[in-house]
Amino acid sequence: ASRLIDYSGAVSFHRKAILVNNDSWIADQYACLSHFTGNTYRQFVLNSPQNISSGEMLVYKNTFYATSGAVTDNWNYQYNGEGIYVLKEGGWNNINRYKYAAIDSLLDFLGIAIDKRDETIWAGSYGGGLLHIKPGSQFEIYKQNKLGATMGDPTSYRVAGLAFDTDNNLWISNFGSAQPLRVMKADGSWKSFTIPFALFQNAVSQIVIDNYNYKWMVSPMGNGLLCYDHGTSIDNIFDDKWRKLGIGSGNGNLPSNDVRCIAKDKNGFMWVGTSDGVGVFQCTELLFAAQGCDAVWPVVKNGNFAGFLFKGQEVRSIAVDGADRKWVATKNGVFLISADGEKIIYEF
């Protein structure tokens, strides 16, 4: 026997269904599990993220935040609509287009940042612009007039990295636009920056701000690493300083120009993951001085042998724990590294 089930919102993208004692049980990709009996139904929603997380993760005041988005190796869209996951006091909240029609157009969330003044969420969509999530599930989307459209893709507003500085200015990587670095200042005004280097596809992604308020930016697609100091004032462009770091002594000494990630450790050192290992900047205060600052390559010891840390491996993400140890995600697994980078503690 067949049954026609028509409950608006109960089923959106069903995967499996069974009939038990004439009751229907339907597993749905977005609506979890539903039990239909007679003219009523119940939904069983799992206390979990809606899907796996591929984007950024952070913790602020015992609340965990993660973005689900990702891009292809060539920085093309994945059309991932899973959104943002928040874990607070043991309960998960999934914020995405399937739950809120107001953000239906926002896909591929990559970067995330928390405004410490009001603990609201800012998240970057790779193509859909910048999203501000306010209490009560109120949403504000920034695109035209604030962000720049992608060159060659004029309806796309790509946000690939976010970071607040100590003055509560929100720095934004506007990947692929003519001015790929933007800032929303603490007073709500905006400013955009033209990067004074030729960059393939004007690619700018992750942003990390160091102890000297310098902005470190991953420039993927083989462009290397960018550093920016706005000087005494964001509005005064005449004392701005820029550096583009890459391979070679005196030029940054990175293991590769194919930079994948950056992280700041407890000493203020900047750890840079590339497609060919790790470099560490331990002299960040000299970055814009005449002598500059080159990365050192940590040497890891394994018995009677020693080699450069993750040489020949693609380093995709680096996180620093409370003991200053480094958690490193590579294409070959996850590793826990000692604070100085000279010992592999665990491999997963």
Question: What feature does the model see in each segment?
Answer:
Residues 1-348:
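Carboxylate-rich, polar loop motifs that coordinate divalent cations or form catalytic acidic clusters
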